[in-house]
Amino acid sequence: MKTQAMEKINLVQAFTTFSDYWSPRVAGDINTSQIKLAKFKGAFDWHHHEHEDELFLVVSGTLRMHFRERDIDIEAGEFIIVPHGVEHCPEALGDECHVVLLEPNTTLNTGNVTNDRTVHALSRI
């Protein structure tokens, strides 16, 4: 059984440890899910996740989640859950957006799409 030390993580400090965009970092594990930190800039790619729901918690900036039928803006301190199978395209409004993701550890950042933004091996904070 995998155990993890009980340590607090300062989100503001953790976001200063990396600078690349759209490349999530694992900050912690909860059973079969992971807490990931990511910096978003501009728009990502349209995609969906066949089996995984995703939670996007905005720490700073504004995230616009595009869906085929509408857009939803998520401000700092707000979150949105995107159910599996729902096509979506995240976009950071303004300069950049810092986001905490809570999702199953099987979740590929680009979902059903494989391209140069796909991250197969995630780094840890």
Question: Which stretches of residues belong to each language-model region?
Answer:
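Double-stranded beta-helix
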Residues: 3-15, 28, 89, 93-125
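A short glycine-rich, His/Asp/Glu-containing loop-to-beta-strand
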Residues: 11-46, 52, 104, 111
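Short, surface-exposed charged micro-motifs
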Residues: 26, 55, 64, 71, ...
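A cytosolic small-molecule/anion-sensing beta-strand core signal
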Residues: 31, 59-60, 75-76
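Short, conserved beta-strand element in jelly-roll/cupin
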Residues: 39-40, 49-67
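Short beta-turn/strand-loop junction motif enriched in small, turn-promoting residues
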Residues: 42-45, 70, 85-87
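Short glycine/serine/proline-enriched coil/turn segments at secondary-structure junctions
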Residues: 47-48, 91
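Short acidic-glycine-tyrosine-enriched beta hairpin
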Residues: 68-84
